[in-house]
Curated annotation (Swiss-Prot):
Protein name, entry field: Neuronal acetylcholine receptor subunit alpha-4
Region (Disordered): 420-459, 503-529
Glycosylation sites: N59, N109, N176
Reactions mediated catalytically: K(+)(in) = K(+)(out); Na(+)(in) = Na(+)(out); Ca(2+)(in) = Ca(2+)(out)
Biased composition (Polar residues): 504-529
Residues linked to a lipid group, S-palmitoyl cysteine type: C273
SUPFAM superfamilies for this protein: Neurotransmitter-gated ion-channel transmembrane pore, Nicotinic receptor ligand binding domain-like
Naturally occurring in which organism (per UniProt): Mus musculus
Positions on the Extracellular side per record topology: 32-249
Pfam families, per the entry: Neur_chan_LBD, Neur_chan_memb
Length: 629
């Protein structure tokens, strides 16, 4: 552009403006140029002839004092398997270099400058217990140089230091990891270390989610190594770190405790349900799957067994032992007299002594088939009882049941019409009649075989006793033609007076039901108003009746012949009674074995509860005593 061309201001107007700008900007620009020129001149003067390989001392005998400090920024990881601790730290170093001094007045009051650390001498301080990576600082940051020769250098570094990790109380463990810093080539006569602070600086520490630093103390040490005759100094920082157990408590400890509790419940489950072994195996499978999931969580080290590993092993043995004991208890529960005989000491210990110690009460389960059969017969007969009162005829029912017998019920057909007054039946031959085994009609029980009330002379009923005697009278052809005998059943119900009953109840039955015996003189005679079903025209001097079992101990018994049908019936009743008695005995012994199994279950229930509690206390007590909880 041409000066003075069209559109340009006149030169006379620009001249004052340029003068004003020049007077205002000239001092600042000259000052900036002067300071930059001063630093440039300073750097040229400091590094002209500077050798970074020689120690910064005036005399060869002087010692370079290096002030050393450590500031931790983050605890990255603690590897229990590889025994390493990874940290992010700032390595603070400070020393004096007499060759790097100047007078600030000569250089526009420049008191400090930042220079590349590669240009100056640096102490070769390394991490002695480095496990992986570089021993020294890899990122060479700039150093801060002061006019008096003091050099400050704080490079960042990520170290993987070796750490002897003790996982005995895992996850309630506390580790002591060290970081040892010192010069690798210079001994104490050349370089000596001085600690800046007694503790590690944690002002810029980023909190970890798994570990917390309890304390970090630095100590100064000197050591003479076998390789060299010189003494080498070092500063060792001890990091006391504690694991935060919340994650392991929720995901590791609580499930183990719950599995142990499930194992205890196995012994509280009744043996009758049949699910004890199923529950044991389910608990074992769940524990196995759980162990597969936590393999990566537990420190895989062979130096020591972690406490949680011991507890898991304890739980595994706990569950396995519960399966073995459950199988044994079920074997005891299903024992019977046919397979095992209960020893006397087992009965004494597990049925008498141990239940009292455990405050156990045996369930009242009683099975008496003999008496149940009698009761069912009473219900079928719709009668108060078949047998006399205990006080008037003691021991009849009890003796029958105790001997393994079951009294056969007697039934009789009631006539549709009222029974008229007729003479008693008399056999033409005055002998015991034959018993017929065919053409047996259905029988219905007497309405009240237990007691009959025939009217006396005054019309008032008199209490008499009842006897049911199984007979079958075969009438002769003449009697059948006359139609005087009307017997419809094998069983005839006789009602005798109290005097007659007393004579019959003086003695207890002593013989077998197969041999039915009585005295003919003691047989009751049918009353005219008897409710029984056989009515005759004429009385008989000797009653032709065959009784099941009657007679006393005073008079000699007389045996009467029985029909084959009655004999088979008595044998069947005896067989049923023997079978029911044996079944009652077997049932009683089986109940004893079941109760023994219940007692064993209760013993192991309390044992496993105590062991589970002791195992839980053993898991938490040692770390608590060590001050880690």
């Amino acid at each position: 552009m041409e000066i003075g061309g069209s559109g340009a201001p006149p030169p006379l107007l620009l001249l004052p403006l340029l003068l004003l700008l020049g007077t205002g900007l000239l001092p600042a620009s000259s000052h900036i140029e002067t300071r930059a020129h001063a630093e440039e001149r300073l750097l040229k003067r400091l590094f002209s002839g500077y050798n970074k390989w020689s120690r910064p001392v005036a005399n060869i005998s002087d010692v370079v004092l290096v002030r050393f400090g450590l500031s931790i920024a983050q605890l990255i990881d603690v590897d229990e398997k590889n025994q390493m601790m990874t940290t992010n730290v700032w390595v603070k170093q400070e020393w004096h270099d007499y060759k790097l001094r100047w007078d600030p007045g000569d250089y526009e009051n420049v008191t400090s400058i930042r220079i590349p650390s590669e240009l100056i001498w640096r102490p070769d301080i390394v991490l002695y217990n480095n496990a992986d990576g570089d021993f020294a600082v890899t990122h060479l940051t700039k150093a801060h140089l002061f006019y008096d020769g003091r050099v400050q250098w704080t490079p960042p570094a990520i170290y993987k230091s070796s750490c002897s990790i003790d996982v005995t109380f895992f996850p309630f463990d506390q580790q002591n990891c060290t970081m040892k810093f010192g010069s690798w080539t210079y001994d104490k006569a050349k370089i000596d270390l001085v600690s800046m602070h007694s503790r590690v600086d944690q002002l810029d520490f980023w909190e970890s989610g798994e570990w917390v630093i309890v304390d970090a103390v630095g100590t100064y040490n000197t050591r003479k190594y076998e390789c060299c005759a010189e003494i080498y100094p070092d500063i060792t920082y001890a990091f006391i770190i504690r694991r935060l157990p919340l994650f392991y408590t929720i995901n590791l400890i609580i499930p183990c405790l719950l599995i142990s509790c499930l194992t205890v419940l196995v012994f509280y489950l009744p043996s009758e349900c049949g699910e004890k072994v199923t529950l044991c195996i389910s608990v074992l499978l769940s524990l196995t799957v759980f162990l597969l999931l936590i393999t990566e969580i537990i420190p895989s080290t062979s130096l020591v067994i972690p406490l949680i590993g011991e507890y898991l092993l304890f739980t595994m043995i706990f569950v396995t032992l519960s399966i073995v004991i459950t199988v044994f208890v079920l074997n005891v529960h299903h024992r019977s007299p046919r397979t095992h005989t209960m020893p006397a000491w087992v009965r004494r210990v597990f049925l008498d002594i141990v239940p009292r110690l455990l405050f156990m009460k045996r369930p009242s389960v009683v099975k008496d088939n003999c008496r149940r059969l009698i009761e069912s017969m009473h219900k079928m007969a719709n009668a108060p009882r078949f047998w006399p009162e205990p006080e008037s005829e003691p021991g009849i029912l009890g003796d029958i049941c105790n001997q393994g017998l079951s009294p056969a019920p007697t039934f009789c057909n009631r006539m549709d019409t009222a029974v008229e007054t007729q003479p008693t039946c008399r056999s033409p031959s005055h002998k015991v009649p034959d018993l017929k085994t065919s053409e047996v009609e259905k029988a219905s029980p007497c309405p009240s075989p237990g007691s009959c009330h025939p009217p006396n002379s005054s019309g008032a009923p008199v209490l008499i006793k009842a006897r049911s005697l199984s007979v079958q009278h075969v009438p002769s052809s003449q009697e059948a033609a006359e139609g005087s005998i009307r017997c419809r059943s094998r069983s005839i119900q006789y009602c005798v007076s109290q005097d007659g009953a007393a004579s019959l109840t003086e003695s207890k039955p002593t013989g077998s039901p197969a041999s039915l015996k009585t005295r003919p003189s003691q047989l009751p005679v049918s009353d005219q108003t008897s409710p029984c079903k056989c009515t005759c025209k004429e009385p008989s001097p000797v009653s032709p009746i065959t009784v099941l079992k009657a007679g006393g101990t005073k008079a000699p018994p007389q045996h009467l012949p029985l029909s084959p049908a009655l004999t088979r019936a008595v044998e069947g009743v005896q067989y049923i009674a023997d079978h029911l008695k044996a079944e009652d005995t077997d049932f009683s012994v089986k109940e004893d074995w079941k109760y023994v199994a219940m007692v064993i279950d209760r013993i192991f229930l309390w044992m496993f509860i105590i062991v589970c509690l002791l195992g839980t206390v053993g898991l938490f007590l040692p770390p608590w005593l060590a001050g880690m909880i």
